[in-house]
Amino acid sequence: MPTTANAKRKILVTSALPYANGSIHLGHLLEYIQTDIWVRFQKSRGHECHYVCADDAHGTAIMLRAEQEGITPEQLISKVSAEHQADFARFGVAFDNYYSTHSEENRQHSERIYTALRDAGHISTRDIEQMYDPVKGLFLADRFIKGTCPKCGAGDQYGDNCEACGATYTPAELIDPVSAISGATPEVRSSTHFFFKLPDFADFMQGWIDGGHVQPQIRNKLLEWFESGFNEWDISRDAPYFGFEIPDAPGKYFYVWLDAPIGYLASFQNLCEREGIDFDSYWRRDSDAEVYHFIGKDIVYFHALFWPAMLEGAGLRTPTGVNCHGFVTVNGAKMSKSRGTFIKAQTYAEYLNPEYLRYYFAAKLTAGVDDLDLNLEDFASRVNADLVGKVVNIASRCAGFVKKLGAGRLAAHCAEPELVTRFVEAGEAIAADYEAREFARAMRKVMDLADEANAYIADKAPWVLAKEEGREQEVLDICSVGINLFRILMVYLQPVVPAMAEQARDFLQIESLDWESRRTLLEDHAIAKFKPLMTRVDTDKIASMTEASKEVLAEEQKLKEQAKGPLADDPIADEIGFDDFAKLDLRIVRIAKAEYVEGAKKLLKLTLDLGGETRTVFSGIRAVYAPEALEGRLTVMVANLAPRKMRFGVSEGMVLAAGDKEGGIYLLSPDNGAEPGQRVS
C-alpha cells in the first residue's frame, strides 16, 4: 500500500453495501466509521480520493418484507435508503456518492460482466434440486427453511446450519422442515441454474491471494478454501425474485451476491457522470488508480474469491486491497436486545454525541480482524479523559489568557520552536499509522503529544505568572505555544472527529486543518472567543440509551421459556372421551379472500372455500398476517361451530392456529395434497 504524501494518488474506496431491509446499528457503524476516517485522512493529505457506497437492494428478503408491509419493493428500498443516509450523516460518514444496486447503471454493469464471462466460456448451466414453497410459489433459500437439527435435535434451526451445536447440513437433511415464510412443508423440485466457473480462475486466484491484497489472517483463510478445492458458484435465482433478469434467460435472475459488489462500479459511475470523472481510468485493467474495499470478515468469501475472479474474467482491474475488520461486541458479549446493547444508530444519536463513538472506535481499531469490544464504562472514561481532559483542555486553559492579555491575538513569535517542531515532525509517524489502518496506534501517539502539551502548560503555570506584574508577555507566549500545539493535534484528529475539528477551525480562525497546514505557525494571529468543543460523556445518558434499546421481553427470559417449553405455561387440558372429540367437524379450507375489518385492530375477515360452499369467519390474526399473504392458502377450520354474531358481522366457524406468550400466532397448514372440504380426523 503506497504511503508517500508527495505524489498525488487516485483512490477509490468502498464500504460494504448495507442491506435495504433493516436499520443501521453500532455493529454496522464500525465499518463505515473506519472507512470514513481513512478517506478523510487521504483527502487531508491532498489525494484524489472518492468514497462510494449504496444500498444492497435486491433479493427475496426485500420482496417478502415489501409484501408484508403492503408496498412495492421499490417503495421499501427508497424508504430504507433515506433512513440509512440519515443515520450515516448523523455519524459524519461523508460518502461522495450513495446509491442503490437497483439502478440502471448496475443493471448495465451486471449484464456486461455476465455477458463477458458467458462469452469467454466461464458460465455453465445445470439442473439442481431445491426446496420449493407450494403456498408462496417460490424456491426457498436455506435461511427460509426451518426444522429440527439432524445432529443434536434442536428445534427451529435454519436450513444450512444449527445455531445450537454449530453443525452444517443441507436442507434435505433437516428433520420436519417447514417454510419459514408460509409454514408449508417444502417440496423438492428441479430447476435449471446458472453457474460461474470459479475453478477456471484457480491459477489467477492463487497469485492474487499471494499478492498482498488482503491481511495475513484473511490470506490464510483464503488458502484453506483454495486448498479444499473451488466449486462453481450458483449465480441465478428463479422467479419470483426482486432483482435483474439474466439476459436471454426469462424467469431467471442474478443472485443478489452477483450484482451487489457490481454496485460499487454503478455507484462510482453515477458519481463520475455527475462530477466529470473518468470512470475507465479507475477500472480498466492497466489503471494506475487504487481501489480499496472495506468489509466485515463475514463476507470475505464473496469479496476475495468470487469478486476478483469475476473482474478478471470480465477484463477489468481487481482491487488493490480488501480490508477486513472484526465484529463489535458490547461489554464483552454479543450485542443483545434484552440487555439494551443491540443499539441502533438512531437510538445512540438521540442520547450521545456520535463523535464519542468515532473516537472510541478509532482508539481501538487496528489493521487486524479481531473483534472490537465497546465497553460502555471504558467508553465514557476514555472519551472524557482523552478528548475532553487532554485535547480540549489545552485550548480551554490557554484561550482566556490570549483573549485577556493579547486582545485575542497570539504572540508574534514562537517561544518554543523545538517543541512545536517535534509536534509537527510527529505527523509523519502518525500518518503512517493512519495509512496502515492502525488507528489505535495513531491515537496513542496523538494522546502522548497531548500529555506533553498539558505537561508543558502545567510546568509553565501561566495562571500563576499572570498574577505577577510585568510577566504578561511571557504568559501570552506560553499560551500561544499551547494554542499552536492544540492546532497541530486537531490536524491529527480531524479524520476522527470532523465536527469537533470544524468547531476548532472556527475557534482558531483558520481556513484549513489539512495535514500540511500543521507546518504553518499561527503568529500574531487572531482567534475567536473559546467555546466548549466537547462536553463530557454523561453516564446517565448511556443508561438511558441502553434502556431505550431493550425489547419488552428479555433475551434471557426467552431462553428460559424455550428451555421449559410451552407445556410449562399451558398444561394439557383435562382428558376427554373419543365421543367428545368426534363432535368437532374439522375441515380443510382454502382462504379465498382476506380483508381488513374497519374499526377492528385485531381482526381479519376471511372468506373460506370448503370445496362446495363458502363461509365467513372473523379471526384475530391481523397483527401477524397481511391479507394478501393469506389468499390461496390452505388451513383448517371448525366447520360445525355455531355461528357467532359480532359487531362486524356473523362469524361462521373458526380457523385453527397455535400461539405463544409473546403474541405469536401460527396458522395451521395441512400437508401437500390436502383439498378443501376434506375432513380432519
Curated annotation (Swiss-Prot):
Binding site for ATP: K337
Cofactor(s) listed in the protein's UniProt record: Zn(2+)
CDD domains, sorted: Anticodon_Ia_Met, MetRS_core, tRNA_bind_EcMetRS_like
Coiled-coil segments: none
Protein's GO biological process: methionyl-tRNA aminoacylation
Gene assigned in the entry: metG
Enzyme Commission number(s) from the entry: 6.1.1.10
Subunit text: Homodimer.
Listed name of the protein: Methionine--tRNA ligase
Any Gene Ontology CC annotation: cytosol
GO MF, any single term: tRNA binding
EC supergroup of this enzyme: ligase
Keyword line: Aminoacyl-tRNA synthetase, ATP-binding, Cytoplasm, Ligase, Metal-binding, Nucleotide-binding, Protein biosynthesis, RNA-binding, tRNA-binding, Zinc
Residue sites binding Zn(2+) per the record: C149, C152, C162, C165
Role: Is required not only for elongation of protein synthesis but also for the initiation of all mRNA translation through initiator tRNA(fMet) aminoacylation.
